[in-house]
Amino acid sequence: MSKKADTYDKYTVELRNNKVDKQADGVATGYFTDEYMGWRASNFTAGYISTAKLIVDGVVKDRWTELKRFVALLKDGGNVNVWYHYDLTKIPETSGEIPIEKPTVIDFKRAVTLTVGKQQIVNKKELTVKGIGKMTASDYIFMNEQGATLTVEGGTFTATKATDANGVVIYNQGICNIKNGTFDGPGFTLMNTGSADMTIENGNVINRNSPTGYALMAAGGGTKLTVKGGRIEAIQSIGGANVTISGGTILNDCKYYALYNQNGKTTITGGYFSGYPGMKDVYIADGTVAIQGGYFEDNQTAAADGYVYKDNVQTVDGITYNYEVVAQ
């Protein structure tokens, strides 16, 4: 076993006239071998090769067996436990599109990282992601198609760069339920278009100094967004989207407003709102925003009919909110 990256290319173990008599009682071969006991194919998942090259009777044993096995499990559906680091972009055989066409659960059993390609995971049916692991891609970790359901119960999800000014973690056109997790991207971290229906109950949606200025976008008349909790670094509602906010913290620490509404239909009944210094908490370019509750730094955007801003200073996580909107 070695942590040196050149171990596989530098050293070779060759077995000639080798034959396995029988499996040893009580000893599992594991996922890293075929019928040859004691050989760990590789530890490519941790960023280095852990064994020498193995040649058995003139045949070089495949060091990517575990990576291929994992991809096959994803394609087959069902419960897929993640115990190890994986990078699906390492070889052509594992870097193609993976359609989720059966109910599938990706369950991170350890704090490990699954690296996927841009738009590689395409959910067409029902996908649940849970556990303490991490997923990363250059862009578009999850494509959630119309008619599909994506549920995220926990984990950390990072898009590393914006290839088209998006930097998307989830591109949603179906049903998406976010119960918890951290979502980090350099653009519209969570993007909802078409017939998207996203509900956020908790979690942290980060806008990493993006040129867009907003971590969460809802666009189009068929799009529905419901925010019940969590921390979201700014929301953009455009093109007739229907947005309901009843809780959570909505802030813009990048450059613009906590909520930008352009031809959207937004209702606010709760939550905490904080725009970038010098910018409004809520900006209405067009469309409607009915403010019927919540806490705000400023009172520059009119409350809904029958509601008023009341002085109620609160400091939460270092941000001071000066007003609460209440019924008259």
Q: Could you tell me what each predicted segment is?
A:
Residues 29, 142, 165, 258, ...:
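Short linear loop/turn motifs
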Residues 2-81, 270-278, 286-328:
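Extracellular/surface-exposed low-complexity segments
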Residues 9-13, 18, 42, 78, ...:
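The right-handed parallel beta-helix/beta-solenoid scaffold, focusing on the short coil/turn
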Residues 49-51, 108, 132:
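Short, hydrophobic/proline-enriched secondary-structure or compact coil segments at domain edges
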Residues 22, 27, 136-137, 159, ...:
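Residues in short coils/turns that link rungs of repeat/solenoid architectures in beta-rich domains
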Residues 53-119, 125, 326-328:
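N-terminal segments that cap or nucleate solenoid repeat domains
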